[in-house]
């Protein structure tokens, strides 16, 4: 794998606990029992709620209350966040996407930027300028108000990046390979447009892995739920599976993420 050459170079890979600083692991392990109790109680509450709902006795739900371990988990995740922010190591993030040739240089020069309607329009304009689509197809892609199939600047549920989607561990062949094989453009939903249009966009682009680099502070999102994100995206998967092979997390509140490399990556012809 291409990313193997970065192993043991002092980088942190969030999907690979073997690269995490020892104090991260130590803090998580010290609180393992608390975390497991929290997860178990959460699962029990959800199961009971579902049973009441299925039996038509939803009004009897006495579990619409906070998990009794929530406050302790909150204190733990705040401590974990502080530990992350004190970490000086850098992390590498991978973004699986399809790019046209001109976009590769743009990304290298400008970094991975947040999506905006202006940037989205610019990309659709370029498709027309490069004769990849015709005027009719241009209208289909551009007419967001009248065509509900045109997506907002969003793909694969919850991303807000112009060139990258949710961060994939590129070892996750089932999801990543499917994505790189089937999706032809950043703004195209697989089921939304004609096969002809999708094929055009697919042929115009090539699969790439964008390797981004930044300080861990990119996780310091200004949100009341920020501590929960650490728990849901890092700690919970670790507790559930020590051998994490796929960890999905979101990059938020960034203006531009520096690029370490943009690599043409063909999962079928490595």
Give residue spans per PLM region:
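Glycine-rich loop/turn
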Residues: 102-163, 172-176
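Sparse, context-dependent recognition of short Cys/His-centered cofactor- or disulfide-binding micro-motifs
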Residues: 78-79, 147-149, 195
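N-terminal, charge-rich interaction modules
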Residues: 77, 93-97
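Conserved NAD+-utilizing ADP-ribose enzyme module
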Residues: 1-66, 70-71, 83-85, 89-90, ...
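N-terminal onset of structured domains
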Residues: 72-78
């Amino acid at each position: 794998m291409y990313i193997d050459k970065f192993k043991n170079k002092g980088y942190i890979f969030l999907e690979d606990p073997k690269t995490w600083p020892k104090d991260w692991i130590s803090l998580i392990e010290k609180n393992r029992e608390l975390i497991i109790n929290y997860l178990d109680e959460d699962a029990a509450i959800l199961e009971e709620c579902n049973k009441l709902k299925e039996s038509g006795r939803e009004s009897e739900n006495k579990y619409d209350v906070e998990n009794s371990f929530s406050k302790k988990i909150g204190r733990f995740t705040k401590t974990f966040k502080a530990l992350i922010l004190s970490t000086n190591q850098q992390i590498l993030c991978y973004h699986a996407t399809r790019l046209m040739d001109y976009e590769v240089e743009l990304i290298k020069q400008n970094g991975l930027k947040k999506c905006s309607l202006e940037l989205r329009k610019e990309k659709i304009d370029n498709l027309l300028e490069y004769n990849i689509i015709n005027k009719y197809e241009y209208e289909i892609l551009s007419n967001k108000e009248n065509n509900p199939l045109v997506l907002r600047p969003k793909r694969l549920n919850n991303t807000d990046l112009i060139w990258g989607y949710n961060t994939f561990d590129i070892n996750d062949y089932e999801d990543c390979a499917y994505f790189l094989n089937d999706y032809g453009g950043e703004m195209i939903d697989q089921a939304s447009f004609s096969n002809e249009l999708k094929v055009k966009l697919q042929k115009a682009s090539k699969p790439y892995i964008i390797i981004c680099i930044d300080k861990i502070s990119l996780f310091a999102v200004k949100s009341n739920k920020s501590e929960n994100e650490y728990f849901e995206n890092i700690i919970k998967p670790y507790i559930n599976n020590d051998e994490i092979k796929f960890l999905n997390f979101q990059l938020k509140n960034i203006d531009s993420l520096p690029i370490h490399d943009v690599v043409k990556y063909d999962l079928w012809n490595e």
